[in-house]
């Protein structure tokens, strides 16, 4: 890692599970007998906006009670000390930002942002409850979570930035992702095809095509190799 010039870091749900953030696999994927994919989609919001917002407020409360762990902190401190690092995360919890990471490409959006359903304007939002559904301060129309839902596309500017990092990377550090969620899975494969060395940190089995696989918790391994 010390010899790497251009590093692409890709993080998934696994880096935040050590902070207590649910992964939505198995029982954690259910809320009031509904599976998370039944709520995280445009059709569900159009039909039941109050229900979807209630679920997202519950998610905010859960994440607000969590703290960035040693892996988040190690990545943030390491990135601030050097140039040439791009962090792309599949997570929406905001823990990288809370750890002080200087620049995060959050592919799937953020729990802590609202977006107007009419004009598209986004704003930061920390509310954990709403007495009434949130509306845009710009136009007064209904806001939604600024999250990329099922059946939606990742914003083009985030994809372009990520692809540029893939093309320039000589090293890819993959932390806590199964390797099946697109487009992050394609980023890893593309970087490896371009000649980058892929290092995976994950205590669980994954489909990441890594040159080096470290089967250890990120909170134990990253503070060691990034110092």
Language-model regions, residue ranges each:
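Conserved catalytic core of sirtuin-type NAD+-dependent deacylases
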Residues: 1-227
